[in-house]
From Swiss-Prot:
Signal peptide positions on this chain: none
Subunit annotation: Homodimer.
Entry superkingdom: Bacteria
Residues annotated for substrate binding in this entry: 10, 32, 59-68, 118, 179, 188, 208-209
Keywords: Decarboxylase, Lyase, Pyrimidine biosynthesis
Catalytic machinery residues: 61
Spans through the membrane: none
Protein name as annotated: Orotidine 5'-phosphate decarboxylase
Catalytic reactions on record: orotidine 5'-phosphate + H(+) = UMP + CO2
One GO cellular component term: cytosol
Gene Ontology BP annotations: 'de novo' pyrimidine nucleobase biosynthetic process; 'de novo' UMP biosynthetic process
Family the UniProt entry places it in: Belongs to the OMP decarboxylase family. Type 1 subfamily.
Documented EC number(s): 4.1.1.23
Length: 230
């Protein structure tokens, strides 16, 4: 199974990292815009990154009542994006409405359900009233998302194998919590190396700090991509 790299843009604006983005554009095909950048500069940042040649993954983790999320998906579909996230804990109806909006307004857009954040452990889940392990909760939410019409999920690398066993093979798995062996885990608790995640069945690996903090970001990205192909 082919596995590709998504570059996390951890900055308030594309202009703040423009030199590195331009250097990486010939090596990395995908870029993720999250809440920090989108809140700071809105849809313009999506267009700027797309204009540099990247496929844009807009990671907004939508979570609201069904009608509001469906309208947000409709609005996002007007942007040059390839992927968009929502929280699976918003429930079946919310995800179903979102999936219908996506199919109507952007059939090629991949709507991804976020399961359990990679910063959360079993202790954190228990604190918010979830008695099960992260793995059990991810599989439960993953099944619910697919039943509601989603064709992709975001999960930690530790839940790739259980999801592959529980879901149809054509479900796309996007995996943060990826750290090369010599990189710090930072604020993530459920992590894996790029090669391990690819072998386990991930379709996309979401990586930011290990590339941007490297002395040579282009070399770091190329090393990860080579590891995925080996």
């Amino acid at each position: 199974m082919a596995c590709d790299l998504i570059l996390v843009l951890d900055a308030p604006s594309p202009r703040d990292i423009a030199p590195v983005l331009k250097r990486l554009s010939g090596t990395v095909r995908w870029a993720k815009i999250g809440l920090e950048m989108y809140t700071a500069c809105g849809p313009d940042c999506v267009r700027e990154v797309a204009d540099l040649g990247y496929n844009v993954f807009l990671d907004l983790k939508l979570h609201d009542i069904p009608n509001t999320v469906a309208k947000a998906v409709e609005s996002a579909a007007r942007l040059p994006i390839k992927m968009l996230t929502l929280h699976t804990c918003g429930g079946r109806e919310m995800m179903s409405w979102a999936a219908k909006a996506q199919q109507q307004h952007a059939p090629e857009l991949l709507l991804l359900g976020v399961t359990v954040l990679t910063s959360m452990s079993a202790v954190h889940l228990h604190e918010v009233g979830v008695p099960d392990s992260p793995e059990a909760q991810v599989v439960r939410l993953g099944r619910l998302a697919v039943d509601a019409g989603l064709r992709g999920l975001v999960c930690s690398p530790l839940e790739i194998a259980p999801l592959r066993a529980a879901l149809p093979s054509d479900v796309t798995l996007v995996t943060p919590g990826i750290r090369p062996r010599d990189a710090a885990a930072d604020d993530q608790t459920r992590v894996m190396t790029p090669a391990e995640a690819a072998r386990t069945g991930a379709n996309f690996l979401v990586i930011g700090r290990p590339i941007f903090k490297a002395p040579d970001p282009v070399a770091a990205a190329r090393d990860i991509l080579a590891e995925l192909k080996s």
